[in-house]
Amino acid sequence: CRNGGHFLRILPDGTVDGTKDRSDQHIQLQLSAESIGEVYIKSTETGQFLAMDTDGLLYGSQTPNEECLFLERIEENHYNTYTSKKYAEKNWFVGLKKNGSSKLGP
């Protein structure tokens, strides 16, 4: 979960962003498979699940729901990409901007 040197993190208030700090306790994420190619991404520090809402905004959810399930794909360049399963028709990816803020799905 890196982009431009940023690690994806889920903060206690549900904010999702990126940090360059490797020692930040909120970058520790656990992936768990729901089925082949479908994963939940959970912060081991806050216990929150990564989620994407109807507008493509990333947030942390205390409980897993439809917005927390992502389709995982290994690309030709060997990077993993994650798209919202619920909004798959919109082709929204999990992403960070170069400044570390979360990028809207579209």
Swiss-Prot record:
Pfam families: FGF (PF00167). GO terms for cellular component: cell cortex; cytosol; extracellular region; extracellular space; nucleus. It comes from the Eukaryota. GO terms for biological process: activation of protein kinase B activity; angiogenesis; branch elongation involved in ureteric bud branching; cell differentiation; cellular response to heat; fibroblast growth factor receptor signaling pathway; mesonephric epithelium development; positive regulation of angiogenesis. Heparin binds at residues 83-86. In the nucleus, phosphorylated by PKC/PRKCD. SUPFAM superfamilies: Cytokine (SSF50353). GO terms for molecular function: fibroblast growth factor receptor binding; growth factor activity; heparin binding; integrin binding; S100 protein binding. The keyword Cell membrane does not apply. It is found in: Secreted; Cytoplasm; Cytoplasm, Cell cortex; Cytoplasm, Cytosol. Keywords: Angiogenesis, Cytoplasm, Developmental protein, Differentiation, Growth factor, Heparin-binding, Mitogen, Nucleus, Phosphoprotein, Secreted. Belongs to the heparin-binding growth factors family. Monomer. Homodimer. Interacts with FGFR1, FGFR2, FGFR3 and FGFR4. Affinity between fibroblast growth factors (FGFs) and their receptors is increased by heparan sulfate glycosaminoglycans that function as coreceptors. Found in a complex with FGFBP1, FGF1 and FGF2. Interacts with FGFBP1. Part of a Cu(2+)-dependent multiprotein aggregate containing FGF1, S100A13 and SYT1. Interacts with SYT1. Interacts with S100A13. Interacts with LRRC59. Interacts with CSNKA, CSNKB and FIBP. While binding with LRRC59, CSNKA and FIBP seem mutually exclusive, CSNKB and FIBP may cooperatively interact with FGF1. Plays an important role in the regulation of cell survival, cell division, angiogenesis, cell differentiation and cell migration. Functions as a potent mitogen in vitro. Acts as a ligand for FGFR1 and integrins. Binds to FGFR1 in the presence of heparin leading to FGFR1 dimerization and activation via sequential autophosphorylation on tyrosine residues which act as docking sites for interacting proteins, leading to the activation of several signaling cascades. Binds to integrin ITGAV:ITGB3. This is Fibroblast growth factor 1. It comes from Capreolus capreolus. The lineage of its organism: Eukaryota, Metazoa, Chordata, Craniata, Vertebrata.
